[in-house]
Amino acid sequence: MKKRVQIILIAAFAAISANLFGQTTTANSTKSSYRPLQLSLVPYIGTNGIESASTSNYTSINLIGGISNNVGAAEIAGVLNIVKNDVRGFQASGVANLTKGFVGGFQTSGILNTSNTLLGLQLSGVANLNKKEANGNQIAGVVCLSKSIKGTQISGVYNYADSSDGCQLSGIANFSRKATGLQAASVVNIADTISGVQVAGIVNKARLARGVQVGIVNIADSCTGVSVGIVNIIKSGYHQLEFSGDELFYTNLAYRSGLKKLHSIVSAGIRPDYNDKTAWSIGFGVGSSKSLSPNLLLDMEMSYAQIVINDRFKDDNKLFKIYVGVDRYLFRGVSVALGLSANAMIYSTSNDFNRKQMENLIPYTITSDKLNEHKHISGWIGGKIAIRFN
């Protein structure tokens, strides 16, 4: 009985809508004069009846869903709003707002917002899709897409814009052909041209980088700013493979990458014959090289290395080093380098084995002090000689 009454009420509502409010002519529908209010159950079942799609409303309230030509102030739906042209004001739905034209104001939905152009804010639980220009902000739980945006894109997974001027923030990845401002992602940023800052948890990639790249790996064809990372692959930049020896480790391998003015250094060293044991190091540093003449560079470096004896990783031994030297070009792709270094070794004294090994490894000391019950620091001046391949 209850179900039968519901069916009768819906049918009556539809009939009244069609007869009382569906009398406008085609000419008047095309002109789309605004009505103060639309009430809808679902699209075409409401106060505008079969003329809903060609009628513009200042306010539209839709129990499940509704369709309008334009909205001039506000639209609310439990599930779905459909607008054939423009929305000016506020649009909210539980699932989706599908607007084909301009959105000026605020769009919010549980899953999806769409627009052709945007001036204001799009907020969605899953996705925001803007076909052309966006001026304002797009915020979504998963993805934000816009042909161009001046403002901010924030998403949990992925942001895309052919042109972005402002800020792209993503939980996973950002992509822009031409980016001005900031790209920040936990995994990867990709831009053809970036004028500003790229910050990524793993990889930054750009054809042309004007500004700063900060990530584990930075990749660019050309960089007119700086790249800060463990590995910086700049096609027109600075790449050197270095074999060297110093007072602690007679065999060291390092990869220097980035730009001459600022590059990263990843290094490893080994001393297999140390007291019938194996001593080795792994380190990271930053360096800068300045031309003194066409064939001579001045090198300045700061580095940190972890020292391990006989694979005892639990012993915390840190070597901090400042190096100043010169790099002399020999012939194509080959140079030699030598210089002096100031060294500070902070090593563990919590067990006798490590304490004795580190005391024997350090060649001599200028300063030696106890930091606490478990740490000791020793300092000395050392040197390095190297051959480098560009």
Language model segments and positions:
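Bacterial Sec-dependent N-terminal signal peptides
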Residues: M1-A27
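Transmembrane beta-strands of outer-membrane beta-barrel pores
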Residues: I45, L63-I67, L80-I82, A96-L98, ...
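Residues that define the transmembrane beta-barrel architecture of outer-membrane proteins
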Residues: T55-N57, N70, T117, S148, ...
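Residue-level detector of the transmembrane beta-barrel scaffold of outer-membrane proteins
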Residues: S60, E75, G89-Q91, Q107, ...
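Residues on the lipid-exposed face of transmembrane beta-strands in outer-membrane beta-barrel proteins
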Residues: I61-L63, V214-I216, I230, T251-S257, ...
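Solvent-exposed loop/turn segments connecting transmembrane beta-strands
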Residues: I67-N70, K84-N85, K100, S115, ...
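Repeated loop/turn-to-beta-strand initiation elements of outer-membrane beta-barrel proteins
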Residues: F102-V103, L118-L119, E133-N135, I149-K150, ...
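Predominantly the C-terminal beta-signal and adjacent terminal strand-loop region
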Residues: D221-C223, K260-K261, I322, D327-N390
